[in-house]
Amino acid sequence: MTKYVYTFGGKTAEGKADMKNLLGGKGANLAEMCLLGLPVPAGLTITTECCTAYYANNCQLPAGLMDDVWKAMKNVENIMGMKYDDPENPLLVSCRSGARSSMPGMMDTVLNIGLSSKTIPGLIKKTGNPRFVYDSYRRLVMMYADVVMEKSEGIEPADGKGIRKQLDDMLDEFKAKRGYKSDTEITADELKQLAEDFKKKVKEVLGTEFPDDAKAQMEGGIKAVFKSWNGKKAVSYRKIEGIPDDWGTAVNVQAMVFGNMGDTSATGVAFTRNPATGDNHFYGEWLINAQGEDVVAGIRTPSPLNDETKNEQNKNFHSMEELMPETYKELCDIRRTLEQNYHDMLDIEFTIQEGVLYMLQCRVGKRTGVAALNMAFDMLNEKLIDEQEVVMRISPAQLDELLHPILDAEDEKKYEVIAKGLPAGPGGAVGVIALTSEKAKFYAEQGIKNILVREETNPEDVEGMRAADGILTARGGMTSHAALVARGWGKCCIVGCDAVKIDFEKGFVYINGNVFKEGDLLALNGTKGYVYDKEIKMINATENPLFQRFMTMVDKFRTMGVRTNADNPDDALRAVSFGAEGIGLFRIEHMFYGKNSEKPLEKLRNMILSDSTDERIAALDELEPDIREYAKATLKVLDGKPLTFRLMDPPLHEFAPQGEEKMKEVAKRLKISYEEVKKRVDALHEVNPMMGLRGVRLGIIYPEITRVQFRALFSATAELMKEGHNPKLEIMVPLTINVKELEHQKNIATEIKAEVEAKYGVTISYMFGTMIEIPRATLVADKIAEVAEFFSFGTNDLTQMTFGFSRDDVNAIVKDYVDQKIIPADPFNTLDQEGVGQLVKLGVDRGRSTRANLKCGVCGEHGGDPDSVEFFYHAGLNYVSCSPFRVPVARLAAAQAAIKESRKK
């Protein structure tokens, strides 16, 4: 029989840290802390496998599960010295989620389970603190009604206002009538009455009585946590983070300890190092006489843990170090123990119950890219990790974040700071105000940069937070939901900016006397916590010496090459500065677009609209010097690094004049009638041009087009050689389907090369290869490799041809397919490893069966996608090629793939 329940507590546990796939991150780490001898309230973990079984069984708990839970609860009761559902000495528990990958705030939690009319009197008698008991009870009613009775049952509030919001409004109204500013001012009798009023409201709104049976509460809590795995916010977060839907969540049932028992009790969240900067200081926040949700939800601005955590908002609050020095020292000792054990920065939650410290959670903490880099090198110096682990510690997304723009410091100096908050997320952002998650998504879809402005964010805002360019909240600390999520995404974010007041009904934002409406502009400096009302210039982040050191370290472990897709000398230079080892895709057709393209485009159109081979050759002869100089400039910049030149690929109609005015200009230049030009342009039209006369087919039907390109390329190479340079030319024939096409083009190359060598008196060395873009080419790759010296997989077209998807028309279809889980991801962003990936592997294997030293690369956009890069590494490719700004990410992904492989040996 499958074991679904694992116990922990009393310095023993059935699990450990490396069991997070089964126990979830929270359950595995609770077990590990017990094994380390740390003070952890006892509990039990229901496995992720049980969650999978729950969904497979039509949302029914597996037979016998609750019997196993009650057996495990005996162990909890023995360790804690209390008994669940006991009228004299009641044990209360929490039900919390715990996926294998951290999903902060995305799933549900219920605290204080076990309070009922049967257990309340006994707890009052035991604690002598009726206020604490009724405060805990009203919290249970609020959470349970929200999580178990409404969300878990799939009840959608008619007016959009859920039961939790209605109960929160009742609480705010209650305090306002009495002039109370804080929950802690409410008396025991008032809390008792509030709880009763809450239960009446729950019955009125949800049509069901709040359960007064402790065992029913427990089962309801467990089911609700499992159901929250498929809640809207959890599904959205998983989609953003790429977390598989079939992982499931564990459920942790843990004995409650209370931070709301008075002034010797508290709750807090801390990081063993600063998650925004990486500084090696204990960093955290705490609240006296509160429960953990108060800190994480950002409902109250918390106090600092120590002097290092003090800021403008909390500098006058007493730190834990000041008020509870002995407990703080104990927490510092735990910090050291955890870092020595995990060799990483940890995010921890703790509760102090009447002076006694308990650890409720530890997990590897989310951090900004800058913090990740600083921590990794600090831990290397501290001998906690080695160089290999430094490379593994920085995710491709964090590396990408380090290249993100920031506010221009010189421009920033010109403007007045209108408000200051806590710098929770890095970099800068400039955009219009969005007051709701929906508005942020709307702006993003329109391509409008925006700042999501909220009182505080909650997990329901996750899609808007992702869509926004920056986040600004009025409340909350550095450990609030907004701060945690923003840091994880490298999103510019300022929290706890108490100068911000929002009137949602009128759609106004008030900041220190300034009035703004939705759509007005703000600028954020997320590194300093500054808010501006002016459009400030954005610049690329200043080069960090640590970044350069890190990339050097990355290249020590990388075995696969990284090139760039570039079409001009400027792009080539930029890519080389990012570490590109050459150009894997140089597209000649880009010389006919944009800057300085008018004259070359005129000549190309003369060729396209020619009426005979002689006319076409004459037009191409005029074009040859332009192609030669265009290629020569980039070959010169690369000097010694390879340039892979793709012969002209697009269908000719793309370059034809469009519209009557343009056609008349061409007619005048060619001295023919407008009608004749229109007739020739119309003749170029194809029903399906992407599968028509393009690529190698152009060079076979019109060999003069191939000749002019070869002559230009060989001449550029010869001239550079004579000037003392070291050009490394690779010529790539696109869209081949068999070896005969390549033989045809290679014969032309051999003929032209001999002519150019004779003219310049040099011997030209170059490589001749092909782009593998059509599925048939992978099947006959062994034959193609008889002529081709290298393959470059054009995965954009290979994906298009394999799926039968048109890249230009399929966006909506792909989105629906991903949403309905018909395919796991957009195959144009992340390589389809089951289909397209297998064709790549087949092409590599068959090609090398003929030519053992066949060089293989990829030049589609997948070359910059980390997951795809790892696949290409295992497929045996020599290099990937991607856009210039993706080069550092591809270098890191290639190094991490090599390290993972080495660790398997």
Task: Show the residue positions of the predicted features.
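Nucleotide/phosphate-binding sheet-loop regions of phosphoryl- and nucleotidyl-transfer enzymes
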Residues: 1-415, 423, 441-442, 448-451, ...
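A short, small-residue-rich loop immediately preceding and capping a beta-strand
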Residues: 469-475, 493, 857
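Structural motif
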Residues: 252, 434, 451-453, 472, ...
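Conserved alpha/beta-domain cores
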Residues: 96-97, 543-545, 553-905
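Extended, non-globular alpha-helical segments
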Residues: 420-460, 511-549
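Internal gly/pro-rich beta-alpha loop/helix module
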Residues: 504-510
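Short beta->alpha connector loops at strand-helix junctions that form conserved
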Residues: 44, 474-476, 495-498, 586, ...
